[in-house]
Amino acid sequence: MKQEGKFILMNREELKVYIEGLKGCKTFTSIQQHHTASPAYKDVKNNNIQLMKSMENYHVKNLKMSEIAQHFSTFPDGTICVGRPLTKDGGGFLSPLNKNSITIENVGNFDIDLMTEEQKQSIVFLNALLCKKFNIIPSTSTLIYHTWVQNKSCPGTKWFGGNTKAAAEKYFIPLVKQSLEDMSFEEALKIVSDKSGVNYDYWKLRKDIEPNFKGLIIKIAKAFGGV
């Protein structure tokens, strides 16, 4: 983890702890998916926080915003940076649809750049964490691509199989749903392990050899009052 002012650069595990610990956030009902276009991959040189500062400078000076527009940015190396606080709506890009909407700017030009596997994993993980935190059900009504509401290609034609609603339903949204399911299972596994006194690794091993084990563990954890 690295912090300069409000900008906090984290890996996925650090991000999970950060988001789960947030208090006093406003209510959010949707998450916007954007690419930066500029900066693109060619502009990323181990300078992630500096890129955040440069984006904020552009948003304030050129777009007349009060601060950086996005709540989060993801980077090719898989790190995620906090920008605008979650006590505020996202800024600028899709006004008036910014109301109760989280803005994610993913660094890259995904009309051209081929997204790294690390960034893919972080984008899916971040969206799943936010859906879990704010009780958002992943769908094309809640995970919104910029191109669906304005005449732009953003978040890019190479974004998770394409930037259409059909592509989102086929490629992106199932990944977010699977990530949410995996999070619920991991939480349930810890609850059942704690309550049963049986080693966590034993339950994980059974998951790999028994069909429908995930659903069973989640049901048991709910009976214990968890998940």
Regions found by a protein language model. Give the residues of each.
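Basic/polar, cationic surfaces and motifs that engage anionic cell-wall
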Residues: 1-38, 42-43, 76-91, 95-187
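Surface-exposed flexible segments
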Residues: 42-57, 226-227
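Extracytoplasmic/secreted envelope proteins and their assembly/folding machinery
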Residues: 49-52, 56, 120, 124-127, ...
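Structured segments of extracytoplasmic/periplasmic soluble domains
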Residues: 54-65, 126-134, 174, 191, ...
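A general structural signal for well-ordered secondary-structure junctions
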Residues: 65, 149, 198-199
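Short loop/turn microsegments at loop-to-beta-strand junctions
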Residues: 68-69
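Short, solvent-exposed alpha-helical surface patches in non-cytosolic proteins
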Residues: 180-227
